[in-house]
């Protein structure tokens, strides 16, 4: 199963492996950024909600300050401002219902604001009630003052009519006291209106009760018109008391509204603190949860990074190590090196292609080196045979040269004999027989020389073909070296690309960069070895070309020698026939002496030509022997170079 996964991963190219690894890391990084952004947005929203709660608490203080200002001045604009503040608070709370804050605390805050607004409406109504009561107090107080002033005038008139009557004076004083008590009641009521305290209330009602009791005591004791005025004044006092009662009811309602607003203010403060604390706890818990999420994602990213590094090491570095080992083995001359892991050759990525190319290169080099080794062995054998044949040819040519010199000497003697033929016919006949015998020997020597020279030409052709095959094999070696050079350059480029990718990966790709540098160094050494082998092959090709050229020259010279030898054979045949004619026509020797002398001179020149050709053949044989030795030396050197490779 593990090998199957490794093979599936190996089907991906190196670029796709890197893209997948870094893509997942970037995706995790994007997830971290998104999570951080969500956390920041969430925390910002919670902070804004807490700021909204703090603003609500500030608006609560503003509403309380507006209430106090309204209570102090009873300004309707101030009351409207308080109502707008409360309405704005309700709108903000309505907007916060969809938030993550405590719904119960929000509902309690809404209820507290509603209660506060209701209490404030009661406070405003109580203020209006007190204002109306103050108007009633002013009107009824003025009526009471007018009634008591009328009563006092009547009593003063009655006292003037009843001058000296002590009871009338006493009643007049009592009425004056009632007027003073009314002024005191008004004073106490005014103090109660301004203070609205329980003490002022008690003082006002106590003064009013004292006034009413005193007025009740005087009922029926005053004269008829004065008594009616007293009743009217008592009615005014009753209306005045009703105004006081109305004002007191407004004060009580105001106090109740104040207590309700104080309670609502406390409830709003508690709800605000509850919301603030709940929001703070929610923010802390959310921050803790988000931190845990970020740590989890970071741990996943770290774990995947480690797994990706391990996978890259398994999928890239190890195959590169195997390719490095195989390239080192090839550079060391071991062409039988095989990958240790058979799955490496089944990979479809660039590394698998590199392994397969290295494998094919090793196979091709092994086959080529084997063929070169066989060809070099054949070349060495052919060179040895050629050297032996060349030695034989050189010996034959030297013998031919000696024989040709002998023929030339004989022909020279024959020419002298022809000149003396007239004086000594028998000597001429004897000389003719000797010439015939020597001509036959020369003919045999010439035939032998022709045979050996033709054999030499055949061996030259074989040597030329061997040199052509050697040249072709060296050219094939050059093409293979071009392939090796191309593979080394591709390996160098791949190692350079791998080093660049490792540099981009940072610390995670440092080991990969070291391996890539080693691969580049190996590729450079491979290129150097390839250059050395290429230099050897070029020198071998140059030597082979020179040997082929020399063999071609030798072949041409050998062909010329064959032609000249044939001509020499023809000349010897002519000499033989001529000598036979001399023997047959011994009687005509004298008359033909001049002609024979001429013929002898021509034969002498031909023999000299044959000797020159023999000398050229000897020189060509020397050159061929030297070329054969050089060819044998090159074959030995090539065998030594090929022996460096282990098949």
Swiss-Prot record:
Instruction: Give the UniProt keywords, A-Z.
Output: Cell inner membrane, Cell membrane, Chemotaxis, Membrane, Methylation, Transducer, Transmembrane, Transmembrane helix
Q: How does this polypeptide assemble, per the annotation?
A: Ligand free ligand-binding domain (LBD) is present in a monomer-dimer equilibrium. AlphaKG binding stabilizes the homodimer.
The entry assigns this protein to a family as follows:
Belongs to the methyl-accepting chemotaxis (MCP) protein family.
Q: Which stretches of this protein does UniProt put in the Cytoplasmic compartment?
A: 1-16, 313-647
Question: Among the record's GO biological process terms, what is one?
Answer: signal transduction
- Protein name, entry field: Methyl-accepting chemotaxis protein McpK
User: What gene codes for this chain?
Assistant: mcpK
InterPro entries in alphabetical order: Chemotax_Me-accpt_rcpt, HAMP_dom, HBM, MCPsignal_dom
Summarize the record's induction comment. Answer: Expression of the gene is not regulated by the presence of alphaKG.
Main location per the UniProt record = membrane
Organism of provenance: Pseudomonas aeruginosa (strain ATCC 15692 / DSM 22644 / CIP 104116 / JCM 14847 / LMG 12228 / 1C / PRS 101 / PAO1)
Q: Give every HBM domain span.
A: 45-287
Role this protein plays = Chemotactic-signal transducers respond to changes in the concentration of attractants and repellents in the environment, transduce a signal from the outside to the inside of the cell, and facilitate sensory adaptation through the variation of the level of methylation. McpK is a chemoreceptor that specifically binds and mediates chemotaxis to alpha-ketoglutarate (alphaKG).
Please give the start and end residues of each transmembrane region: 17-37, 292-312
Q: Which residue stretches are annotated as topological domain Periplasmic?
A: 38-291
Keyword tRNA-binding tagged: no
Compartment annotation: Cell inner membrane
**Gene Ontology molecular function: any one:** transmembrane signaling receptor activity
The UniProt entry, under Gene3D superfamilies, shows:
1.20.1440.210, Methyl-accepting chemotaxis protein
Which topology term describes how it sits in the membrane?
Multi-pass membrane protein
């Amino acid at each position: 199963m593990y090998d199957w996964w490794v093979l599936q991963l190996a089907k991906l190219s190196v670029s796709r492996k890197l893209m997948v690894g870094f893509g997942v890391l970037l995706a995790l990084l994007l997830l971290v950024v998104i999570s951080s952004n969500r956390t920041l947005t969430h925390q910002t929203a919670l902070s804004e909600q807490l700021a909204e709660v703090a603003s609500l608490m500030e608006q609560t203080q503003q509403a309380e300050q507006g209430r106090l200002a309204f209570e102090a001045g009873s300004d309707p604009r101030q009351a409207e401002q308080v109502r707008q503040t409360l309405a704005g608070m309700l709108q903000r709370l309505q907007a916060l219902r969809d938030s993550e804050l405590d719904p119960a605390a929000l509902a309690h805050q809404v209820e507290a604001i509603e209660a506060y607004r209701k209490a404030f409406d009661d406070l405003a109504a109580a203020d209006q009630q007190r204002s109306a009561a103050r108007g009633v107090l002013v009107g009824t107080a003025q009526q009471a003052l007018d009634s008591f002033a009328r009563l006092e005038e009547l009593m003063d008139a009655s006292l003037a009519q009843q001058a000296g009557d002590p009871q009338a004076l006493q009643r007049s004083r009592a009425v004056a006291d009632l007027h003073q008590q009314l002024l005191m009641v008004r004073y106490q009521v005014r103090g109660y209106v301004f203070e609205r305290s329980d003490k002022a209330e008690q003082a006002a009602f106590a003064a009013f009760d004292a006034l009413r009791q005193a007025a009740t005591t005087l009922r029926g004791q005053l004269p008829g018109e004065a008594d009616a005025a007293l009743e009217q004044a008592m009615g005014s006092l009753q209306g005045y008391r009703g105004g006081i009662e109305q004002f007191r009811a407004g004060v009580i309602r105001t106090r109740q509204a104040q207590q309700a607003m104080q309670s609502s203010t406390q409830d709003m403060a508690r709800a605000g603190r509850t919301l603030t604390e709940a929001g703070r706890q929610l923010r802390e818990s959310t921050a803790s949860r988000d931190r845990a999420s970020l740590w989890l994602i970071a741990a996943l990213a770290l774990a995947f990074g480690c797994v990706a590094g391990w996978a890259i090491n398994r999928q890239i570095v190890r195959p590169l190590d195997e390719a490095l080992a195989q390239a080192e083995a090839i550079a060391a001359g071991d062409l039988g090196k095989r990958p240790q892991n058979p799955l490496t050759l089944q990979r479809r990525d660039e590394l698998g292609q590199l392994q397969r190319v290295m494998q094919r290169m090793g196979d091709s080099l092994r086959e080529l080196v084997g063929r070169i080794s066989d060809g070099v062995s054949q070349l060495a054998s052919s060179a040895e045979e050629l050297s032996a044949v060349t030695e034989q040819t050189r010996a034959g040519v030297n013998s031919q040269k000696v024989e040709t010199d002998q023929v030339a000497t004989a022909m020279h003697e024959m020419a002298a004999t022809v000149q003396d033929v007239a004086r000594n016919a028998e000597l001429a006949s004897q000389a003719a027989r000797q010439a015939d015998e020597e001509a036959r020997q020369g003919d045999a020597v010439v035939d032998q020389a022709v045979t050996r020279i033709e054999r030499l030409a055949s061996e030259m052709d074989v040597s030329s073909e061997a040199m052509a095959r050697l040249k072709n094999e060296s050219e094939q070696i050059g093409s293979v070296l071009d392939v090796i050079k191309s593979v080394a350059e591709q390996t160098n480029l791949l190692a350079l690309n791998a080093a660049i990718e490792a540099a981009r990966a940072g610390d995670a790709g440092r080991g990969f960069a070291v391996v890539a540098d080693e691969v580049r160094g190996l590729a450079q050494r491979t290129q150097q070895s390839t250059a050395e082998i290429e230099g050897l092959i070029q020198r071998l090709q140059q030597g082979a070309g020179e040997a082929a050229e020399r063999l071609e020259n030798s072949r041409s010279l050998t062909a010329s020698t064959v032609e000249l030898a044939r001509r020499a054979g023809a000349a010897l045949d002519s000499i033989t026939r001529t000598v036979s004619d001399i023997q047959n026509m011994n009687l005509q020797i004298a008359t033909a002496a001049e002609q024979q002398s001429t013929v002898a001179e021509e034969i002498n020149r031909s023999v000299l030509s044959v000797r020159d050709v023999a000398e050229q053949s000897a020189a060509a044989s020397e050159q061929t022997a030297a070329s054969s030795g050089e060819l044998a030396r090159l074959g030995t050197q090539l065998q030594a170079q090929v022996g460096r490779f282990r098949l």
